[in-house]
Structure formats: structure tokens, C-alpha cells
């Protein structure tokens, strides 16, 4: 009799166990399908732009809402978390081109909904050991040059000489990102990005000129490469 009771008890436990397995398994399948469905729906509504820095220390994250054409830059924390930091100022058309100018500077070139070209710069560092907020324009005061291109930063603004073409930008046409990059704007479009290389030092507290290099990068959706400039004179 005892043996029969034990057998019946074990059989009941196994039956309950099998039922719970079926229930749990069914719930798991439903949750997985729900998650996949939400992911597909979110993927359709949102375009993700992800790019990792050359030294693998920083991640550029931009999410574009396909319905509103609003793109938002996210700042990452601890490598896996991201929070919205700022929205790009122009509605976008879904096309983005990302180029890392330095390990801590990412240039995002994109076309707005009205077909104009713009640049957003993700910055993840500083120069001069980050003692205080600094402005890029004054810190690169002087003449910088490379083959077929020259940049002059003076009291009235920044001038770019490229392939025989002269372009002058007043300070209200210079948009700063962080403390290490600016975008030069003309006719309501981005024209150039100027970035401070990791080797750059302003030497602002000394009597000597800036040292190191800067980089200039043309705003275009076509394939192009940044150009490194050397300091020539003040």
C-alpha cells in the first residue's frame, strides 16, 4: 500500500512538473515573440547609427525617428548604457556619413530633409589637460597649412584657402562642439570641420605659439579624407 502511494505521489509530481514545464515554456515563447515583434517595430521606426572609435574607447550613437525625421545624439555610459544628449538641429533624410578625425572626435555628415548638407561633431575628450573651457578659434590663432590648403584664424574670423578658392567665415559662422572642434557654416550649410588633434597644445599661458597639428575635413556626402595641417606662423 505504501509503495502504491509513493508511486502515485511521484506520478502526480511528474504530471504537475510536466504541466508547469508546458506553461513556462508557452509563456517564454510568447515573451520571445512579443520581444521580437517590438524589436522589429522599433527597428522600422528608428534608424540607428553606431560607430566605434579607432581606439575602441568611445561609441557614437545617433537614433533617427523615421516618422518625424528627428535625429538624436546619445551619450554612452560605462560602455553599455546610453542616454539622449541632444537632437540634431535639422530634420534628416536618413543618410549619415561618419568619420573619426581623432580617437575622441567623430564627424557626422548628413543631409537635411531640405537636401542641405550639415555636420554634427561628437566629442569625447579635451585638450590642454582640460583645465577650463576653451574656444577652438582663438586657440588656433595663426596660419596652418598643408598641400593645397591653408587655414588662417585671426581676430575677425577664420579663412580657408583651398585649391585657389578663398572662403571667409565670421565668428557667428563658426559653430563649436565641445572644446575640440568647430564647424564652419556658409549659406545655411556646413562647409568644413576643424578639429584639434590629440597632439595639439594651445600654449595659451605661454609666450610661444600653439604646437601639434589640427585637422580640416570638408562637408560632403562624397567619399573624402581629413587633411592634417601644420602650424606655420602667427
Placement of each model-derived feature along the sequence:
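Tryptophan-anchored aromatic micro-motifs
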Residues: 136-152
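Short, hydrophobic/aromatic-rich segments at coil-to-beta transitions
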Residues: 104-106, 141-143, 157, 178-183, ...
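Short amphipathic beta-strand/extended segments with alternating polar/hydrophobic composition
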Residues: 82-92, 117-123, 167-177, 193-196, ...
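Beta-sheet ligand-binding and adhesion/scaffold domains
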Residues: 106-134, 186-234
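N-terminal glycine/threonine-rich, aromatic-flanked beta-hairpin/loop signature
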Residues: 69-73, 149-189
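Internal/C-terminal transmembrane anchor helices
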Residues: 18-57
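Membrane-embedded alpha-helical segments of integral membrane proteins
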Residues: 1-15
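Membrane-interface segments at or immediately adjacent to transmembrane helices
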Residues: 44-117, 128
